[in-house]
């Protein structure tokens, strides 16, 4: 395993750990999720370029489209929650509260 793959995997693990540690704020969770998507995009692109897979060359673009949709939905949810409750705590997203 080359150092490039190890560094990308380490970036993914650090983003995942950040997602687990800073899960109380929605903005921190969204940033960690974007870090995970970015590391997956880079890993997929490097793997496709190294293996000369021409049929799978559209997969990183599809991943970027899903990441952009996820970011747009996450930011709209962040704006809605911050306008409604005044904070970005994830506990405010529980719909079962009275």
Curated annotation (Swiss-Prot):
The chain crosses the membrane at residues 1-21, 29-49, 61-81. Gene3D superfamilies: 1.10.287.3510. Core subunit of the mitochondrial membrane respiratory chain NADH dehydrogenase (Complex I) which catalyzes electron transfer from NADH through the respiratory chain, using ubiquinone as an electron acceptor. Part of the enzyme membrane arm which is embedded in the lipid bilayer and involved in proton translocation. Keywords: Electron transport, Membrane, Mitochondrion, Mitochondrion inner membrane, NAD, Respiratory chain, Translocase, Transmembrane, Transmembrane helix, Transport, Ubiquinone. It holds the Pfam family Oxidored_q2. Its EC number is 7.1.1.2. GO terms for biological process: ATP synthesis coupled electron transport. It is a multi-pass membrane protein. InterPro entries: NADH_UbQ_OxRdtase_chain4L/K, NUOK/Mnh_C1-like. Core subunit of respiratory chain NADH dehydrogenase (Complex I) which is composed of 45 different subunits. This is NADH-ubiquinone oxidoreductase chain 4L. It is found in: Mitochondrion inner membrane. GO terms for molecular function: NADH dehydrogenase (ubiquinone) activity. It comes from Canis lupus familiaris. It catalyses: a ubiquinone + NADH + 5 H(+)(in) = a ubiquinol + NAD(+) + 4 H(+)(out). Belongs to the complex I subunit 4L family. One of its GO terms (cellular component) is respiratory chain complex I.
């Amino acid at each position: 395993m080359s150092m490039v793959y190890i560094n990308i995997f380490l970036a993914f693990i650090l983003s995942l750990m950040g997602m687990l540690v800073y899960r109380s704020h929605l903005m921190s969770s969204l940033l960690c999720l974007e870090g995970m998507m970015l590391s997956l995009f880079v890993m997929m692109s490097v793997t496709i370029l190294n293996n000369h897979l021409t049929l799978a060359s559209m997969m990183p673009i599809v991943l970027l489209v899903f990441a952009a949709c996820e970011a747009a939905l996450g930011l709209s949810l962040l704006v809605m929650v911050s306008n409604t409750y005044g904070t970005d705590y994830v506990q405010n997203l529980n719909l079962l509260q009275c």
